[in-house]
């Protein structure tokens, strides 16, 4: 049996068929789980959606100080913190994270009855350091990436209905643009809009 935080929270039918056959043949199971995606992103919104008759938009969002992430090599070499904005935009993180988040969006869309468009909109934004910022991988130098925001949006007829977002900041000081965690600090947020609200 396999439990993984790397996707497989809601595999599409075409993706699931070979895995299901292998699991049945081997007497095994595959369970995808996690926090975001894998829990906060889809399970909480589905639970909260029971309080409204007509859901119009769902948002799940993470706000994290990435200085607490204990893998300097991942921060530097994969997530590309400390790189130039141009280099950071080539990071595999949009696609890597997108696999799990797309499954989350599909789960919410299916369970709430949204006829989702085929294309999920993926966005990657960066903020740069304006002064040196201490980090687990060493100083983040001015002009290099010190914060990243990844957003995946599912639409119906081009209108946003489900949004999953991560905000990873090397603290809140010396960033351009001046992103912050807001008054609430680090957190996960879930918002379900509908009628009645």
Residue positions per predicted region:
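Rossmann-fold NAD(P)-binding glycine/threonine-rich loop
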Residues: 5-29
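General beta-strand structural signal in soluble alpha/beta enzymes
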Residues: 2-5, 30-33, 59-60
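Conserved active-site and cofactor/substrate-binding residues in soluble primary-metabolism enzymes
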Residues: 14, 18, 35-39, 95-103, ...
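Active-site-lining helix/loop region of Rossmann-like oxidoreductase modules
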Residues: 49-193
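Alpha-helical support elements that line or immediately flank enzyme active sites
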Residues: 38-51
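Short, ordered loop/turn segments at secondary-structure junctions
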Residues: 5-10, 35-36, 63
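A short glycine/serine-rich beta->alpha loop
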Residues: 27-33, 91-92
């Amino acid at each position: 049996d396999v439990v993984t935080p790397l996707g497989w929270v809601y595999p599409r039918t075409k993706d699931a068929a070979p895995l299901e056959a292998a699991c049945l043949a081997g007497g095994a199971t595959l369970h995808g789980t996690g926090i975001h995606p894998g829990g906060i992103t889809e399970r909480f919104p589905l639970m909260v959606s029971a309080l409204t008759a007509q859901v119009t938009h769902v948002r799940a969002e993470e706000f994290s100080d990435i200085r607490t992430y204990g893998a300097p090599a991942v921060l530097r070499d994969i997530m590309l913190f400390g790189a130039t904005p141009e280099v950071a935009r080539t990071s595999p993180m949009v696609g890597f994270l997108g696999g799990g988040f797309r499954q989350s969006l599909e789960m919410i869309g299916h369970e709430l009855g949204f006829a989702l468009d085929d294309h999920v909109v993926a966005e990657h934004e960066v903020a740069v350091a304006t002064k040196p910022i201490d980090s687990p991988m060493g100083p983040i130098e001015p002009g290099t990436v010190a914060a990243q925001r990844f957003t995946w949006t599912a639409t119906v007829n081009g209108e946003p209905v489900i949004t999953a977002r991560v905000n990873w900041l090397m603290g809140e000081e010396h960033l351009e643009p001046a992103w912050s965690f807001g008054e609430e600090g680090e957190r996960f947020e879930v918002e379900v809009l509908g009628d009645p609200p």
